[in-house]
């Protein structure tokens, strides 16, 4: 017997000796192994500077906010399905639509662009990472912290912000909207807005300074061009919003009187907000135009039609979007109607050029309608309808009739949902093998598309008619005598179908992660054109083990189909 050891300690030593003799160490419980794996993943996410991991964090977080915003939307549509107040008070309804709009514009669509940019843009230009990796990580954590500040208003005694996502003065003041919810909204958007500005600087620096040898500006993919000009557009827009929000907080907490209505502050706020707000529409649109422009040539088996004109259209949209902000203010009577109306009509021209090029790429192409192409076509249909209604309300006489009605709600959802959500899912299905090395299931993807497409059209098409009949936006209630009940019920049914459409996608992601087969090649679609399809799926830490020669705007296609490339070159000569 060993002196000085307790019986329990002796038993432990004997078991260890048996384990050594049999060479079969004791197995760690499954739960403990899972906790260790999760812990390591959390540490890796918290400390990473890898642009791909940060991009995945952006995509996952923004999609989480998208789901939360969708839940808030379904709660609103539940209230509006029938006349009378069923579920919420007027104040609670105000909180729902305020946080819904804020999430969808500033916590979902904007960081979603940063997510796709982080993952894809360095691959497309042959860069090993972003120019400032640590700044990139800081930007993500600032976005997450700011977003949590905004939604944490629901946990305060007075509830979340309730003055609408564009927070018109004087309703945004502490007098009319007291409580910490408004302050959390204001400062949360300051933090997340600074994050977006820092990301824009990072993206511009990367595109200008870190392109691979041979990757000239006019060999860059259209997606990267759109990211460049989106980031340029962020630089004047977001600092204006940040400054306006800081002045608003000074009003609320320190009595600064910047936005007092007696001093013209109400109109000042509108000018400052919409000087940010309309460029913001294109900040969240241009990257998704780029995603669609990457997808259509691959499934048309053709190069993009009109590469240079697409770049020119992007430049024109960038500059025109900065001079149309006051078309949101026609009804104030305090803006130059002819100028802003003309500029609003004019911005439709470069957008029409893009449609011409997208359709021109498909004409006489060998089209195949895999899931990414379906989503791209859904984008074309939906965004076109939204753009047509936008041309209508660019006319001041029509805008006077339709402003602040459900026609505006329908228009903005056709433009923004039609662009961001349809192109987001197109990008997910297209680049998922590049993200993870596995293809999402095609059958589930098609179920997802058609369910969402039908749900979206059912929800928002009828809202044009509601607005034309005079139903105001942001009302929690209406009378049966108003005649809005039938269309509101249809819209609410569509909203729940829209919500249910997300379930096939979530199941598809889980099923692919658990049981999906590795694609095993650089380009699972077979006709990828840009440089990300010339590296493994998923890529290594610094993206490329070797770079192919870059002699055109389609380096991956040149690499994988040299015979076609040589034939095309001989044909051109």
Swiss-Prot record:
* Pathway the protein contributes to: Energy metabolism; oxidative phosphorylation
Give the UniProt record's GO annotations in the biological process aspect: aerobic respiration; electron transport coupled proton transport; oxidative phosphorylation; respiratory electron transport chain
Q: What class of enzyme is it?
A: translocase
Question: GO molecular function terms here?
Answer: cytochrome-c oxidase activity; heme binding; metal ion binding
**EC number(s)?**
7.1.1.9
The record's principal subcellular location, in a coarse class, is membrane
Cellular localization per UniProt: Cell membrane
Task: Give membrane topology per the record.
Answer: Multi-pass membrane protein
Q: Which residues bind Cu cation?
A: 278, 282, 327-328
For activity, the cofactor(s) needed are:
Cu(2+); heme
Residues bound to heme a3: 411
Q: Which UniProt keywords apply?
A: Cell membrane, Copper, Electron transport, Heme, Iron, Membrane, Metal-binding, Respiratory chain, Translocase, Transmembrane, Transmembrane helix, Transport
Entry GO terms, CC: plasma membrane
Cofactor: binding comment: Binds 1 copper B ion per subunit. Binds 2 heme groups per subunit.
- Which residue windows are transmembrane per the record? 53-73, 103-123, 141-161, 188-208, 227-247, 272-292, 304-324, 329-349, 373-393, 412-432, 447-467, 490-510
The UniProt annotation places Fe(II)-heme a binding at: 100, 413
Reaction catalyzed? 4 Fe(II)-[cytochrome c] + O2 + 8 H(+)(in) = 4 Fe(III)-[cytochrome c] + 2 H2O + 4 H(+)(out)
Family, as annotated: Belongs to the heme-copper respiratory oxidase family.
PANTHER family in the cross-refs: CYTOCHROME C OXIDASE SUBUNIT 1
> What role does this protein play?
Cytochrome c oxidase is the component of the respiratory chain that catalyzes the reduction of oxygen to water. Subunits 1-3 form the functional core of the enzyme complex. CO I is the catalytic subunit of the enzyme. Electrons originating in cytochrome c are transferred via the copper A center of subunit 2 and heme A of subunit 1 to the bimetallic center formed by heme A3 and copper B.
Subunit text? Associates with subunits II, III and IV to form cytochrome c oxidase.
State what protein this is by name: Putative cytochrome c oxidase subunit 1-beta
Organism in which the protein naturally occurs: Streptomyces coelicolor (strain ATCC BAA-471 / A3(2) / M145)
List the taxonomic lineage: Bacteria, Bacillati, Actinomycetota, Actinomycetes, Kitasatosporales
Q: What is the name of the gene encoding this protein?
A: ctaD2
């Amino acid at each position: 017997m060993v002196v000085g050891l307790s019986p329990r300690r002796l038993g432990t030593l004997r078991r260890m000796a048996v384990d050594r003799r049999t060479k079969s160490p004791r197995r760690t419980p499954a739960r403990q192994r899972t906790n260790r794996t999760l812990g390591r993943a959390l540490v890796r996410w918290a400390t990473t500077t890898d642009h791909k991991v940060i991009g995945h964090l952006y995509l996952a977080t923004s999609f989480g906010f998208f789901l939360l915003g969708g839940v808030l939307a379904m709660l609103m549509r539940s209230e509006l399905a029938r006349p009378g107040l069923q579920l919420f008070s007027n104040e609670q309804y105000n909180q729902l639509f305020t946080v819904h709009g804020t999430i969808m514009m500033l916590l979902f669509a904007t960081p979603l662009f940063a997510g796709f940019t982080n993952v894809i843009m360095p691959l497309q230009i042959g860069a090993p990472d972003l120019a400032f990796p640590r700044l990139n990580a800081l930007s993500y954590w600032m976005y997450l912290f700011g977003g949590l500040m905004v939604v944490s208003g629901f946990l305060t005694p007075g509830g979340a912000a309730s003055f609408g996502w564009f927070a018109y003065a004087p309703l945004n003041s502490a007098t009319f909207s007291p409580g910490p919810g408004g302050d959390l909204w204001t400062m949360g958007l300051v933090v997340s807005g600074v994050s977006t500005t820092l990301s824009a600087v990072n993206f511009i620096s990367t595109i200008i300074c870190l392109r691979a040898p041979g990757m000239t500006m006019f060999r860059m993919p259209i997606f990267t061009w759109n990211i460049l000009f989106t980031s340029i557009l962020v630089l004047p827009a977001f600092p204006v919003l940040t400054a306006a929000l800081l002045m608003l907080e000074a009003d609320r907490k320190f009595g600064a009187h910047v936005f007092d209505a007696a001093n013209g502050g109400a109109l000042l706020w509108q000018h400052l907000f919409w000087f940010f707000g309309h460029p913001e529409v294109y900040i969240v649109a241009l990257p998704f135009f780029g995603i669609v422009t990457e997808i259509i040539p691959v499934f048309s088996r053709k190069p993009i039609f009109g590469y240079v004109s697409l770049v020119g259209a992007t430049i024109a949209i960038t500059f025109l979007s900065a001079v149309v902000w006051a078309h949101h203010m026609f009804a104030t009577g305090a803006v130059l109607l002819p100028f802003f109306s003309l500029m609003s009509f004019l911005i439709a021209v470069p957008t029409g050029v893009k449609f011409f090029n997208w359709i021109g790429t498909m004409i006489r192409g060998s089209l195949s309608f895999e899931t990414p192409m379906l989503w791209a076509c859904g984008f074309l249909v939906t965004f076109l309808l939204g753009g047509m209604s936008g041309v209508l309300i660019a006319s001041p006489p029509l805008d006077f009739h339709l402003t602040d009605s459900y026609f505006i709600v329908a228009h903005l959802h056709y433009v923004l949902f039609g662009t961001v959500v349809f192109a987001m899912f197109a990008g997910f299905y297209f680049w998922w093998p590049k993200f993870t090395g596995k293809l999402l299931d095609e059958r589930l993807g098609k179920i997802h598309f058609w369910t969402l497409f039908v749900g979206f059209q059912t929800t928002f098409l009828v809202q044009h008619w509601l607005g034309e009949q005079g139903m105001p936006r942001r009302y929690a209630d209406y009378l049966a005598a108003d005649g809005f009940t039938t269309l509101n019920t249809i819209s609410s049914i569509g909203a729940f179908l829209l919500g249910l459409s997300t379930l096939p996608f979530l199941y598809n992601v889980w099923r692919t992660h658990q049981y999906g087969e590795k694609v095993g090649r650089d380009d699972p679609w077979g006709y990828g054109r840009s440089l990300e399809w010339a590296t493994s799926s998923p890529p290594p830490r610094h993206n490329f083990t070797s770079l192919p020669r870059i002699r055109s705007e389609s380096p991956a296609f040149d690499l994988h189909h040299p015979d076609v490339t040589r034939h095309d070159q001989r044909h051109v000569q």
